Amino acid sequence: VESDWSSASYFFSIAALSNSATLTLSTFFKDSLQGDSKLVDIYKIFGIETKFEEDHIILRKNKIDLPKSINLNLKDSPDLAQTIIITCLGLGVDCTLNGLHTLKIKETDRLIALKNEIEKFNVDKVEITKNSITLENNSDLKHEVIIETYNDHRMAMSFAPLSLLVPIIINDPEVVSKSYVNFWKDLESLGFNILKINR
């Protein structure tokens, strides 16, 4: 049984936001039927090379010149939107993501949630329509932003890789258990420093 490509997306983001990275992810196949497998092509934009082995993939970060902006239609893989826009936020790449009308009817209205949380980082602009989101970056990310997760597992997991660049605080981190119980343990195994805050 193939693993879930949308769960793999957070590790593509980690690789993209790292100075250098080689990550191995188990049970992914080249001829996947999952729409979210288009991650492989999308993350080439950010310098991530994906090598397919017999039953796993190896992600490698290559140094490349990043584009100033990207425009993607994600109508067949809308669950990747949160991860991709946070990758763009971290890399300083402006982006417009289209085909996102279904994100308004997920665990939360993900477009509004993304706009609310990304704006906390002092970006120049975040605009949403009924099926798109546009980000215009600023050069300096604000530190120790508190991320609300809106009872949405993907909000917690998509913002987590940003902690490679700036310290962040994620409220209700247990929400990841909806789809990926060991997410925080897996990040710790990669060297992430995760502290529980009693507030």
Regions found by a protein language model. Give the residues of each.
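Short, structured segments at the rim of ligand-binding sites
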Residues: 1-199
